[in-house]
A protein has these predicted regions:
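Acidic/aromatic-lined carbohydrate-recognition and catalytic surfaces
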Residues: 2-200
Length: 200
């Protein structure tokens, strides 16, 4: 069954850049790569995701749960910066990042805010507000998450850290590709604001 709304077209005349041809690419799911800044880690019960509170994994070597989308290991952009020399020695020429924009999941394919890097991957400079109580899945009470992911200082500091990462990667001869998921978003997205994080 053919349906035009599902037909994706290639960009006419697009040519693969020479630097990408034959390049050694290394894909990074940031949360599971390396924790370089523990101050930005998602906290247990910081908010609810898919009907339950999220959790911080304390033991980096603990295997993910079958439904591990609420588990956070704490990997971040500082962790990638800390490993650039290692990646260069591996022969990596391009880092391909899974989505890194503000999002409630560890995989970040359900974007909350396309304008900013998630402060849980970047920098949290303003950090206050209450966590959810056990069993409370109402994100209107998730004040810590709201501050962490909507405070402009946190968002701008996170974007700045990403720029720093790109500059340092380039200094190591590594190019950066990010996965931008623009054909769908999640219920936390500021346009829908189902969780009331953007309501004044």
């Amino acid at each position: 069954h053919f349906s035009e709304e599902w037909e994706f077209e290639f960009t006419p005349g697009f040519k693969t850049p020479d630097w990408a041809k034959g390049a050694v690419m290394y894909q990074i799911m940031v949360d599971r790569f390396n924790n370089g800044d523990k101050s930005n880690d998602v906290m247990t019960n910081e908010y609810a995701y898919i009907g339950r509170g999220v959790s911080k994994v304390e033991n980096w070597m603990e295997p993910p749960a079958v439904d591990g989308t609420r588990q956070f290991y704490g990997g971040d952009l500082q962790g990638v910066i800390d490993k650039l020399e290692y990646l260069e020695k591996l022969g990596v020429e391009v880092i391909y990042f899974n989505p890194i924009f503000v999002s409630p999941s560890n995989h970040k394919y359900d974007t909350q805010d396309y304008d900013y890097i998630d402060p849980h991957f970047g920098k949290i400079v303003n950090d206050n507000g209450k966590l959810l109580k056990d069993g409370d899945n109402n994100n209107e009470h998730a004040q810590r998450y709201k501050v962490r992911t909507t405070d402009l200082a946190n968002l701008e500091a996170s974007n700045k850290l990403f720029v720093e990462l790109v500059e340092k990667a380039h200094a190591h001869g590594i190019k950066i590709i990010i996965d931008g998921v623009f054909n769908h978003c999640g219920s936390f997205n500021k346009w829908m604001d189902k969780e009331k994080f953007y309501t004044k």
